[in-house]
A protein has these predicted regions:
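Selective transmembrane-helix segments that form parts of the transport pathway or gating/packing helices
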Residues: 91-118
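Long, hydrophobic alpha-helical segments
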Residues: 52-68
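Membrane-interfacial helix-loop-helix connectors in multipass membrane proteins
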Residues: 40-51, 115-134
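Short helix-to-coil transition segments within interhelical loops
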Residues: 83-91, 170
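Transmembrane helix boundary and interhelical loop/hinge segments in multi-pass membrane proteins
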Residues: 16, 65-85, 99
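Hydrophobic alpha-helical transmembrane segments of polytopic membrane proteins
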Residues: 132-151
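Aromatic- and glycine-rich beta-strand/loop motifs that create alpha-glucan
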Residues: 1-26
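Conserved small/polar residues in nucleotide/adenosyl-binding loops
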Residues: 165-166, 170-175
Length: 175
């Protein structure tokens, strides 16, 4: 199974390398979101510095929806999902492989965004090791949850409207 997952991940990463969607569309979008947040809160510099980590993760969530949508569309547009099944690759291997590919793409975007946060917001990061560990763990979780959500809504016509907020809207909240 791990070999098949690795094959799916390398396939998705090769497609991404050829199409350059992450660097051509996703990274500029993420940078634009950071700049817009900076304009929105620049009048109150202390608030911007306090909100930097939250703005970083909100931007990552926006970017993750784009990355997951792209990963899912690769399989659904030309019937690649059926080809993978006919090739004998099990669905869990496809899930793991796609999660790895999305996680790698998100890690690249997070590195660029960290540089952007330091440059644009003058953020002072005290514990780089903790930041990288948090990014790694959160990225694995976001990629796995996003890939699962993408697989669940792959056949739905209005799949673009299904997002993380829809899943969270039905959570029970203790008051």
């Amino acid at each position: 199974m791990l070999r098949d997952a690795w094959l799916v991940a390398t396939k998705d990463l090769q497609i991404e390398r050829r199409s350059r969607v992450t660097f051509g569309q996703v990274v500029p979008f993420a940078g634009l979101v950071l700049v817009l947040f900076g304009f929105a809160l620049d009048a109150n510099r202390p608030v911007l510095l306090q909100a930097t980590s939250g703005l970083f993760w909100v931007t990552i969530m926006f970017v993750s929806t784009l990355a997951v949508q792209r990963s899912t569309s690769i399989e659904t547009t030309d019937g690649a999902r059926r080809a993978l099944l006919l090739a004998g690759i099990e669905p869990p291997a496809v899930f793991v492989g796609k999660s790895i590919a999305v996680a790698v793409q998100l890690l690249v975007v997070e590195i660029v965004l960290l540089i952007g946060v330091v440059v644009l917001y003058s953020a002072d990061i005290e514990a780089w090791g903790l930041v990288f560990a948090t990014c790694l763990i959160a990225t694995v979780g976001i990629a796995a949850a996003g890939t699962l959500l993408g697989a669940l809504v792959a056949g739905v016509r209005a799949r673009e409207t299904v997002s993380y907020t829809h899943l969270r809207a039905h959570e029970t909240r203790p008051y």
